[in-house]
Amino acid sequence: MFVPRSLKIKRSSNDDLKSGEAKKSKPEAGGLQVEGDRDTPVHTSVTEEAVTADKPGHASSTNSPSCQLAEVSSTGPDEGVKDSHPSEEPVKSFSKTQRWPEPGEPVCVVCGRYGEYICDKTDEDVCSLECKAKHLLQVKEGEGSLRPSSPQRVAAEPESPLDAFYVYKEHPFIVTLKEDQIETLKQQLGISVQGQDVARPIIDFEHCGFPETLNQNLKKSGYEVPTPIQMQMIPVGLLGRDILASADTGSGKTAAFLLPVIIRAFSEDKTPSALILTPTRELAIQIERQAKELMSGLPRMKTVLLVGGLPLPPQLYRLRQHVKVIIATPGRLLDIIKQSSVSLSGIKIVVVDEADTMLKMGFQQQVLDVLEHTPGDCQTILVSATIPDSIEQLTDQLLHNPVRIITGDKNLPCASVRQIILWVEDPAKKKKLFEILNDQKLFKPPVLVFVDCKLGADLLSEAVQKITGLNSTSIHSEKSQVERRDILKGLLEGDYEVVVSTGVLGRGLDLVNVKLVVNFDMPSSMDEYVHQVGRVGRLGQNGTAITFINNNSKRLFWDVAKRVKPTGSILPPQLLNSPYLHEQKRKEQQKDRQTQNSLVTGANLMDIIRKHEKSSSQK
């Protein structure tokens, strides 16, 4: 069958055969290459015996490739035939029992684990009996040639052309609408667009003319009517334009960029052809899950997830399987690029999701380094919940003749979220949280509680479980990737009534079943506040966000008042009467007046001339 990469064979538990005398020589055709111990001179040979791995004592068939075992023994110059050592480790039956490879070690051509054995039929590396059988079945059925087991650069490789090439054309109904009707529609939906020759918004997914398989996938995934950001962003993206998009959290931005990505990748005959960059593993995992749902049934459409915190070998193995869409965090993708394990020369569309988070987390240079390896003419889409000045600068740097699409207020929380601001001093926070969790009107599990430190998350989760009896857990960056994934799955499936989190769940994740968020600690910026509040109100659903505030957040008082009060929320008197708020307001108004005075307009032109003449006469 195969031999391990050592002198002694790992024998199956029912193998009672004995090895014969051997000489260390190159095997004949059909034999196996075996490496000897360089420190001890030995002579080896290879013989093959048919055994049954699953049924002891059962006669094996020479036609069954998974039942053949190559046997090797070591003898000195004067030694006779000896039995294998009774403690010899048996050949691994299942791939899950094999470890992951270390750098430079052989990799199983089937699953990407450590390639401990060499298949006697193909000379390829495999990790177990299970993968050997799968490997030979693939060869027999002619499903494609196997990839080399060693790390290898994945270049953009051509595939067979698609049977049908998709081209977006405006639906006849959209074409018949007058310009004033389109503008009225945009105003009613809160869509703001800047750019030249911008495509008209769609009103229904059917207006896109997608392949029927994709239309069915949209319905199965619960997409019935496009949201405002989807109405405008999808047709613009389908036409290949660069985009800067901003919308309320939970407004459907992910599907808005996934559909153009899928169509572009589906239409291209090179792999990989699309790249999506995200700041966190959790967000990347979620995006890949949504992408797979929408791609289901589309031929040759594969994704690969390249993120830190998960084993690298299976990611590299998946990358070699002619994937169309790469979903990655910048750091892991850069590592793979530096290993020359992937080429991005065939990329036609790039999406940078949660771009504001990328910049805040210090990933800007990593993003730029990744994009240097993509073609200069590829379509680029920047997506963000907020648009600070740094995003504007990045837009000027990366996008060519972009279309700017904004729905809602680009820096305000989602309108479907009821916001409650409570003045709570630090010693009273736990008591107030327990009151909320015991309030039948407010408590709607699962509840997401945000804190500002990892230790605080663990301690608060334990306190909630002890005092209220609710099933509670904590999640933060020190939890392993497996733990975080299981907690997130449990949150989505309703296994937890309360989840206490640091900012790890504050961005991008679709937690559609969360109806109540409590900001136990006020976020350090209003951008973070917008994102954490946005964990409720997903896709227009109503939700409640309660925030505890006190003088520890005094530098944000005026920002809170400006952004939250217009939504109709009642602010606590301690906040409204705070001297810090009034001082911040005064400084901002003074700065605005200075800016206005520095501008020359028809209204102030004469005043500026008089001031200039007066100052000149005094000199």
From Swiss-Prot:
Biased composition (Basic and acidic residues): 12-27, 79-91, 583-594
Keywords: ATP-binding, Cytoplasm, Helicase, Hydrolase, Isopeptide bond, Metal-binding, Nucleotide-binding, Nucleus, Phosphoprotein, RNA-binding, Ubl conjugation, Zinc, Zinc-finger
Region Disordered, annotated ranges: 1-101, 583-603
InterPro entries: DEAD/DEAH_box_helicase_dom, DEAD_box_RNA_helicase, Helicase_ATP-bd, Helicase_C-like, P-loop_NTPase, RNA_helicase_DEAD_Q_motif, Znf_HIT
Residues found modified as Phosphoserine: S64, S160
Per UniProt, location of the Glycyl lysine isopeptide (Lys-Gly) (interchain with G-Cter in SUMO2) cross-link in this chain: K26
Record PANTHER family: ATP-DEPENDENT RNA HELICASE DBPA, ATP-DEPENDENT RNA HELICASE RHLE-RELATED
Entry text on domains: The Q motif is unique to and characteristic of the DEAD box family of RNA helicases and controls ATP binding and hydrolysis.
Family classification: Belongs to the DEAD box helicase family. DDX59 subfamily.
The protein's name in its UniProt record: Probable ATP-dependent RNA helicase DDX59
UniProt organism field: Mus musculus
Species lineage: Eukaryota, Metazoa, Chordata, Craniata, Vertebrata
Gene that encodes it: Ddx59
